[in-house]
Amino acid sequence: MKVKGTYFQNSKEKPLVYGDVEIINPKRRRLRGEDEKEGILAESVIVGFCGTDKELMHMGEGGRLSEKFPEGTKRLINGHEGIVWVPEQERFAIVLIRGGDSYDPTRYTEDETYFEYGCDKADGLFSDCNYYNPDMLLPLPDGCVKNGKLSLSFAKKLLFADPYGCMVFQLERMEDIGSAHNFRVEMAKHKCGEEEGRRLAKKHIFDRTVIFGMGTTGMFIGDLIRQNYPEAEIVFVARSEEDKPKVQFVLNHVKAKYVQSCFDSNEKLADAIKEKLGGTATTFLGVSGSNIEHEIAFRYGVLGNNGLYNSFSLGPQVKFDTMPFGFKNQIILSSINFRQEHMEKAIQILAKSSYDEIVELIDKEEFTSDPIDAYCNKIYSAGAPLKTAVIWNEKYINEEE
């Protein structure tokens, strides 16, 4: 079945194309132990653009996409953030992106396999319609749909179900690791048992948190830390001027402090961060995609003893001196993933949020007429909004609210 859509391919000149593309329907399973199922057809309604899409385009330019293509094809229909209409079931749904032959997608092993709709071995949402495993079409919260149409404000909020789900998992993982890492210190300090020690360590790992970068992932993890640990000191670090609207939105939403990265040396930047934070960081989160993250954390000492360094960034190579790293008893972790329960929790949180305010729309015709130009000069340009989306099928959207 041929449909219109955008897809990535290995091509230096045309890594991203809009046009006719054949969609396929291989059997897929959600988790190991479940049956493989043919997908059911769903129509794309609204789709968001993610930094992963930009990275995939660059991979196509360099001829490095072959391992990402669905079996038997030489292209990947992209798009992993959005909402679809399922005609067979007469309902809207959010696509659970990751599935495959694994017991737990957040900790799949070498002998297990996985796929990600729109990212890895499975086609995504930037097409008129596509096939999805029926077990991976998650319901929307009550109140999103009226008279058969999806509220635009709700749709904008729920675009973030994938990245917010990632951050729900990240919070869980940092709580788990922080608790295991420092509970014996808390037991010694408070003369308490293991259960209380773990509870205290889980809380105090976020006492002084640095978020290096100010994209949506950084904002979401900051939001979750603030919701769960209201006494935490949170400092964002980014290049933008503090009075910029997107900076103010993040700072007001998370109730955080800010350091602009505009110093003539990394040492001065590190000193400014520690001063604003009131000490060294208990947790350092890297979300900027820059190699400066690990230098600030380790070489210039922003991450304190017994602290966590968690990188969400694509690209940077983390370097550290093993001797001082060992004596400071620090932990480095990195994982970009989530389970279904994390996405379901994200959907409920987002439905009550104000994140629709940071989503701007690009006209579908403007995007499809030259998708590469739209990527480079609007969606991912220096002055781009925090999130851009496109209404793919306007007949399902209620824009008059």
Show which residues each predicted segment covers.
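C-terminal hydrophobic helical "lid"/dimerization subdomain
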Residues: 1, 35-38, 178, 268-272, ...
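Glycine-rich cofactor phosphate-binding loops and adjacent beta1-alpha1 units
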Residues: 180-209, 226-229, 244-331, 397-399
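NAD(P)H dinucleotide-binding glycine-rich loop of Rossmann-like/cofactor-binding domains
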Residues: 80, 99-208
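Glycine-rich beta-strand-centered segment in the early N-terminal region that forms part
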Residues: 24, 28-48, 61-107, 123-124, ...
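Hydrophobic/small residue at the entry helix of a nucleotide-binding pocket
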Residues: 216-217, 242
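Rossmann-fold dehydrogenase core element
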Residues: 307-310, 320-360
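Residues in the short beta-alpha loop(s) of Rossmann-like NAD(P)-binding domains
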Residues: 238-243, 315, 338
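Glycine-rich Rossmann-fold phosphate-binding loop(s) that bind the pyrophosphate
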Residues: 163, 213-216
